[in-house]
């Protein structure tokens, strides 16, 4: 289990499925009124050693979100009615027919009826921001590609030549293939020292004068005829 303090009033607790299993818990246990559910939450709080400002702070609001390999629990200080009773959960529909998401949505609605809806709305907003932040961090740490290659389609050789004459940017390599009655060109770009948007920008420029590729380079090597190797664009640009 891991705990992260998001703000003075909010914590995020990550509990793996292994943690649940080790303690004899299942997702459905959070909706079935029984003592071990309460005991589990008390145990988690004790193990994680809550920050001082959370100790003896009264009622806490929880937002539980199931993931593929864990559950995320967002906790915030709340004015939720202290009379909330787990026995109230016995009125739920047949939980055996519910997905984990349905389980926790139902639990959230019950908590709204009993207590502080504002606290739950705050948790939902915090969870959304955390998810967006995580996705942004994943994007920033994603390994940058050194090269990218595109395949372009042309109905005739004249359009291939016309396209070649529009290329005024650096190209690492290019090949020209013919397959059936159509022409196909592969274009390799070097992305080193280029901004993240460069590949998309160049592809958009190419599509102004070419069709989006319908064949892969591997397919063309096997089924097409390679007319020009390596420097197809340079050779085509020399045609008057």
From Swiss-Prot:
GO molecular-function terms, A-Z: protein-macromolecule adaptor activity
Matches recorded under Pfam families: MecA
InterPro entries: MecA_C_sf, Neg-reg_MecA
Superkingdom to which the source organism belongs: Bacteria
Entry function: Enables the recognition and targeting of unfolded and aggregated proteins to the ClpC protease or to other proteins involved in proteolysis.
Family note: Belongs to the MecA family.
Domain notes: The N-terminal domain probably binds unfolded/aggregated proteins; the C-terminal domain interacts with ClpC.
Subunit annotation: Homodimer.
Protein name: Adapter protein MecA
Species for this entry: Streptococcus mutans serotype c (strain ATCC 700610 / UA159)
């Amino acid at each position: 289990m891991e705990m992260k303090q998001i703000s003075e009033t909010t914590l995020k607790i990550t509990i793996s499925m292994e943690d649940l299993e080790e303690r004899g818990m299942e997702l459905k246990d959070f909706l079935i009124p029984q003592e071990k559910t309460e005991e589990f939450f008390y145990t988690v709080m004790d193990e994680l050693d809550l920050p001082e400002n959370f100790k003896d702070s009264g009622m806490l609001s929880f937002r539980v979100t199931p993931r593929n390999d864990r559950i995320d629990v967002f906790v915030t200080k709340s004015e939720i009615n202290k009379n909330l009773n787990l026995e109230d959960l016995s009125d739920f529909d047949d939980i055996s027919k519910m997905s984990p998401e349905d389980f926790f949505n139902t639990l959230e609605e019950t908590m709204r009826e009993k207590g502080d809806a504002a606290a739950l709305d705050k948790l939902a907003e915090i969870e959304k921001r955390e998810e967006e932040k995580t996705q942004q961090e994943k994007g920033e740490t994603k390994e940058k590609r050194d090269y990218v290659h595109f395949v372009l389609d042309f109905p005739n050789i004249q359009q291939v030549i016309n396209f070649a004459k529009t290329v005024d940017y650096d190209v690492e390599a290019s090949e020209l293939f013919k397959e059936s009655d159509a022409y196909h060109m592969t274009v390799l770009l070097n992305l080193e020292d280029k901004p993240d948007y460069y590949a998309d920008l160049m592809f958009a420029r190419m599509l102004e004068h070419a069709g989006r590729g319908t064949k892969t380079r591997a397919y063309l090597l096997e089924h097409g005829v390679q007319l020009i190797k390596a420097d197809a664009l340079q050779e085509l640009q020399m045609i008057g």
